[in-house]
Amino acid sequence: MQLQYVLTLLWIIFAQNVFSRPTISKVAPENIEFFGRVTSYQKPVKVPDPISMYQQFAGLAQQSNCFKTKINATIGDAQLLFSWGDDDKNQRMQIFRSKSLGIVTSWSGMNVTSLTSLLSAADLFLVDVDRKYFPRVKKGSKLYDGFQNAFKRAAPVLVKKIQYFQELYDEDRVSLTGLSFGAALADIALPYVKENLKRGHIHRVVVFGHPRIGNQEWADSLDTYAEGKFFYVVNGNDIVPHLPPREFGYQQPSGQIWINPSNSSNWKLYPGQENVHGANSIFGFSIKDHTGVYFRTEIGSFWGHCPATIGQD
């Protein structure tokens, strides 16, 4: 198992350095030209929501990484209602009630001290989506095998608890967030949760350090389900949003917000999939930028603020 993990990392590094990207010529605002996949040339715009909203999401994304959190703990305008997972085989999943975001589910990032957690993320091959969980996504949709398996273990608990807390608090808004591995799980959860809500709607999905997790068809499906409410935030030169490489068939969905330079207050939305003006305009190589300051709020994984703070960094 350790050998599998090491070989996976070496293969990713090899691909990032050896596979050259084809020359891109601007011919349309959104041009299908990268191995038949979408590349956006749209100019960046201002982020569409108040900064306070992104800060609240960042705080909850950080909080799910904290080992010791008591039920009813308060993070910004949110109260912790439920926690599940051991952060080993199962990523920690926490559910909050937020005054501004509704019922929010947050997943922790990868536990780098756990071999089981590392190997869950190391299973990088694209496989067909499980139609039991995703019956209406686009034909041909594929997902990163390790992430899909991790989500399937959490799915029954997730929907049951969201439905319960919606009824308990008479709340129609449902939001999702997470860092890294947790960001991938929030992405995968969006279609599943939307299909299984008995009331209400997806309010927002805002994730941080989001890796590529599926192919073009999955990215298209996510865009359809999200209806413009999914955003993934890239901090500076963070390497993770560049992995796995597009050369392996992977594709990011729409909704990139790029903070550049890292940890700064300079952020913009880069519309469309794989926008050439956003994080793809540089060679992302930094591991340090993966955990950093997002919207003046630290997301430091297990080494960050616990309890999380909001807008204080």
From Swiss-Prot:
<comment type="function">
    <text>Secreted lipase involved in Dandruff and seborrheic dermatitis (D/SD) probably via lipase-mediated breakdown of sebaceous lipids and release of irritating free fatty acids. Shows activity against monoglyceride and diglyceride substrates, but not triglyceride substrates and does not exhibit regio-selective production of diacylglycerols. Cleaves oleic acid from 1,2 isomers of diolein on both the 1 and the 2 position of the glycerol backbone, resulting mainly in free fatty acids but no monoolein is detected.</text>
</comment>
<keyword id="KW-0378">Hydrolase</keyword>
<dbReference type="GO" id="GO:0016787">
    <property type="term" value="F:hydrolase activity"/>
</dbReference>
<comment type="similarity">
    <text>Belongs to the AB hydrolase superfamily. Lipase family. Class 3 subfamily.</text>
</comment>
<dbReference type="InterPro" id="IPR029058">
    <property type="entry name" value="AB_hydrolase_fold"/>
</dbReference>
<feature type="active site">
    <location>
        <position position="290"/>
    </location>
</feature>
<dbReference type="InterPro" id="IPR002921">
    <property type="entry name" value="Fungal_lipase-type"/>
</dbReference>
<keyword id="KW-0843">Virulence</keyword>
<dbReference type="GO" id="GO:0005576">
    <property type="term" value="C:extracellular region"/>
</dbReference>
<dbReference type="Pfam" id="PF01764">
    <property type="entry name" value="Lipase_3"/>
</dbReference>
<feature type="glycosylation site" description="N-linked (GlcNAc...) asparagine">
    <location>
        <position position="111"/>
    </location>
</feature>
<keyword id="KW-0443">Lipid metabolism</keyword>
<feature type="glycosylation site" description="N-linked (GlcNAc...) asparagine">
    <location>
        <position position="72"/>
    </location>
</feature>
<feature type="disulfide bond">
    <location>
        <begin position="66"/>
        <end position="306"/>
    </location>
</feature>
<feature type="active site">
    <location>
        <position position="238"/>
    </location>
</feature>
<keyword id="KW-0964">Secreted</keyword>
<dbReference type="InterPro" id="IPR051218">
    <property type="entry name" value="Sec_MonoDiacylglyc_Lipase"/>
</dbReference>
<keyword id="KW-0442">Lipid degradation</keyword>
<keyword id="KW-0732">Signal</keyword>
<dbReference type="GO" id="GO:0016042">
    <property type="term" value="P:lipid catabolic process"/>
</dbReference>
<keyword id="KW-0325">Glycoprotein</keyword>
<keyword id="KW-0134">Cell wall</keyword>
<feature type="glycosylation site" description="N-linked (GlcNAc...) asparagine">
    <location>
        <position position="263"/>
    </location>
</feature>
<feature type="active site" description="Nucleophile">
    <location>
        <position position="180"/>
    </location>
</feature>
<protein>
    <recommendedName>
        <fullName>Secreted mono- and diacylglycerol lipase MDL5</fullName>
        <ecNumber>3.1.1.-</ecNumber>
    </recommendedName>
</protein>
<feature type="signal peptide">
    <location>
        <begin position="1"/>
        <end position="20"/>
    </location>
</feature>
<keyword id="KW-1015">Disulfide bond</keyword>
